[in-house]
Amino acid sequence: KGGMMCCYEAMKRVGPTGNVVALVICQEDADLLKSMNLCHHAIVGSATNPTEVLEKSLAVNGGKEYDVSILIVNVPACEMAAILPVRDNGTVYFFSMATDFAKAALGAEGCGKDVTMIVGNGYTKDHAEITLSELRENAQLKEYFEKKYL
């Protein structure tokens, strides 16, 4: 849910020159995100394999590193997959209770990445209204959530 909502919001904000890339575990998920226009590219791979994620991420972004990476997973050992594709002075947003912040900090230092790391706490002011507003804006996303969760 969180990943789809982040993709939707990112697509609204990046403008005509932006590039929203999602990392998913299977082709079915990639096809779903693409069919719903929630990303420009969907990479199939495991966030526990940071080298693979880096290679695939750069391949769909013209060889350029990213400004922002948002990690939304429920498995450990995904920190470096979020950090490696991000440019120096870029931002990595960790929105996962599985994140090991010592691994993230030491990993970024070890590979020479000067990135801003933000810890998401699951709350932002007016988050419920923002979510409902986005579901009102996107009937396809609302319908998907209703079928899956109601």
Located regions from the model:
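N-terminal Rossmann-fold NAD(P) dinucleotide-binding loop
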Residues: 3-7
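Adenosine-nucleotide cofactor-binding segment
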Residues: 11-77
